[in-house]
């Protein structure tokens, strides 16, 4: 009995020490480039734009991971400008714009966003969000927001997947919780009823609705983010569902749920 009590106390002290882990910095570097060619419909310079950004966390292992995501070399103002000017779609659009102007049609300006940021952290994990968005002269822009959870304090950290945080055989239960959250989301956002919401989910997803790998910590539990068009029409945006800790008991590993209590997000 004494040994068990001593072991429990030791584990408590270890976790308490981890809770005091050094805070991460939310500092980031944003680089913006423009490439202008001709005039827009108001007679102003028509400029294509590219925005690139990356975080500076102050943790050598995490910052090294960030560097790898940037192709092994952090971008500079010059490299971003060069990339935009040399982009084949920019060159092709400039040619098409010349034809549009001759035909009395509106020219188009391309817009790209490629950013990585630290969204938050816990004593043992860091959450990164990557925004990859573009407007290429269609009805609207389109992009994806990818979440990555990494273990802190180790070299070459690997993304934490659902299988890494779930207890054995619990994925179906997690999927059910997320689906129920989606039903509520549809009822509130579309001003419909539960029956029509469930019918919509089946019509759009068939029997393929599943828990997404795109997750992060939240002070109240775990948050799951779906991309535009992934589980519903574009008008629904990017549905995001936070499942409370109490509902995840017996589904997600206790040590993961414990981390959520100490989650700190970017302000």
Which positions does each model-derived feature cover?
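Bacterial N-terminal signal peptides that target proteins for export
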Residues: 1-7
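Compositionally biased intrinsically disordered regions enriched in Thr/Gly
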Residues: 21-267
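Bacterial N-terminal signal peptides
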Residues: 8-16
